[in-house]
Amino acid sequence: VLSGTDKTNVKGIFSKISSHAEEYGAETLERMFITYPQTKTYFPHFDLHHGSAQIKAHGKKVANALIEAVNHIDDISGALSKLSDLHAQKLRVDPVNFKLLGQCFLVVVAIHHPSALTPEVHASLDKFLCAVGAVLTAKYR
């Protein structure tokens, strides 16, 4: 459960990263595909090379979904309900991949905003990403 401080910390760090949605989203995906190559299996039709238009486009979708969750931080499940349905029922993404993506996103944020990612902000952002992952996997059966 996100505390008031967590919500403030998450909103604060996203105010710094929102304008870089496509860049950070693509970087996160590229990092995940390299670090955890098994995640590539969900993207057989993608050009997975650095800088590909498909990675940039999907990275922007990922980042925009996170921004949507931040904008509705008191109702993440409502904000991401359709995305949860898509991943659980149509795409059938292994739930562990959301944790891997979250870890890669944390690394990208740390690279670009090292002074802003204090231990407290890191903890809050990690809790937020876990909450998003829980919402996205809530409809799995």
Swiss-Prot record:
Globin domain boundaries: 1-141
Which InterPro entries does UniProt cross-reference here?
Globin, Globin-like_sf, Globin/Proto, Hemoglobin_a-typ, Hemoglobin_oxygen_transport, Hemoglobin_pi
Please, which domain of life does this record's source organism belong to?
Eukaryota
Q: In which tissues is it expressed?
A: Red blood cells.
The answer to whether UniProt assigns keyword Disulfide bond to this entry is no
Supply the PROSITE patterns for this chain.
Answer: GLOBIN
GO biological process per UniProt: hydrogen peroxide catabolic process
Q: Cellular component terms, GO, for this chain's entry?
A: blood microparticle; haptoglobin-hemoglobin complex; hemoglobin complex
* Record-level Gene Ontology MF annotations: haptoglobin binding; heme binding; iron ion binding; organic acid binding; oxygen binding; oxygen carrier activity; peroxidase activity
The set of disulfide-linked cysteines is: none
Binding positions (heme b): 87
Q: Which UniProt keywords apply?
A: Heme, Iron, Metal-binding, Oxygen transport, Transport
Could you confirm whether the keyword Heme appears in this record?
yes
Q: A Pfam family name for this chain?
A: Globin
Q: Where does O2 bind?
A: 58
Q: What does this protein do?
A: Involved in oxygen transport from the lung to the various peripheral tissues.
Q: Give the record's family classification.
A: Belongs to the globin family.
Q: How does it assemble?
A: Heterotetramer of two alpha chains and two beta chains.
UniProt name for this protein: Hemoglobin subunit alpha-A
Could you tell me which species this protein originates from? Struthio camelus
